[in-house]
Amino acid sequence: MPNASLVIANWKMNGNRELTKTMSAALREKLNQLQQVKLVICPPFTLIGELANQCYYDDIAIGAQNVSEHTGGAFTGEISTAQLQEFGVSYVLVGHSERRQLFAETDKMVNEKALATVNAGMTAVICVGENKAQRDEGNTWEVVAQQAQAALADLPKEQAGKIVLAYEPVWAIGTGETASPEQAQDVHAKLRALLVEQFGAIGEKMPLLYGGSVKADNAAELFAQKDIDGGLIGGASLKESDFVAICQAAQG
């Protein structure tokens, strides 16, 4: 049986106004069959308002792909927590591997963004994961643990309910490769222990998502793992039929 309760779509720099309409309509048709699964869509910033309007009466949460650690000021091109909240955003991706690799986001920045997000009352979806060289060298857990511990630093226990961890093996993002259910579960089990160590019993209930080429045909097997509570979906979240099928796999 699936263990999933949260599925997040990350559209990255894709999509348009038409996709907000067709995707929300496709999900709306199936919402009564997906009552055990929380659905979140993270579109590009320019589509947040449009998607929020499309989903106004639906149980579909709106997420952002990034946020500034600053509250405002002379930070050209950045966006604050307050500006996101004005458009109904309740989830924020923090530390995605593409932000770390392409935009030089450091562990310190990821931590500051996570703190800014939860302090504003939104849920921070903190992304961690190793690249292929690190996995091949046997350093998967060392890398993942270091990223997770750095991102969670100074987060008080009372904020634990506003934290989601997403394990995204970098070598499996957009490559067609996927960690086996057993490989993913191994990392998730260790992340679960890390959360319990830092936050106590509530760590048992904090969502752990898998992100790394999740597709309609492998979602059910991944979601059946004990410590995989859902998915962070990239490419497959851009096609209505594929994303609906993944959400249905989470529901079981």
Swiss-Prot record:
GO cellular component assignments: cytosol
The protein's name in its UniProt record: Triosephosphate isomerase
Protein's job: Involved in the gluconeogenesis. Catalyzes stereospecifically the conversion of dihydroxyacetone phosphate (DHAP) to D-glyceraldehyde-3-phosphate (G3P).
The reaction(s) this protein catalyses: D-glyceraldehyde 3-phosphate = dihydroxyacetone phosphate
Active site: 96, 168
Family: Belongs to the triosephosphate isomerase family.
CDD domains, alphabetized: TIM (cd00311)
Residues annotated as binding substrate: 10-12, 174, 213, 234-235
Protein localization: Cytoplasm
Known EC number: 5.3.1.1
HAMAP family per the UniProt record, alphabetical: TIM_B (MF_00147_B)
Keyword tags: Cytoplasm, Gluconeogenesis, Glycolysis, Isomerase
GO MF annotation list: triose-phosphate isomerase activity
Swiss-Prot/TrEMBL GO biological process terms: gluconeogenesis; glyceraldehyde-3-phosphate biosynthetic process; glycerol catabolic process; glycolytic process
Pathway annotation from the record: Carbohydrate biosynthesis; gluconeogenesis; Carbohydrate degradation; glycolysis; D-glyceraldehyde 3-phosphate from glycerone phosphate: step 1/1
Subunit architecture: Homodimer.
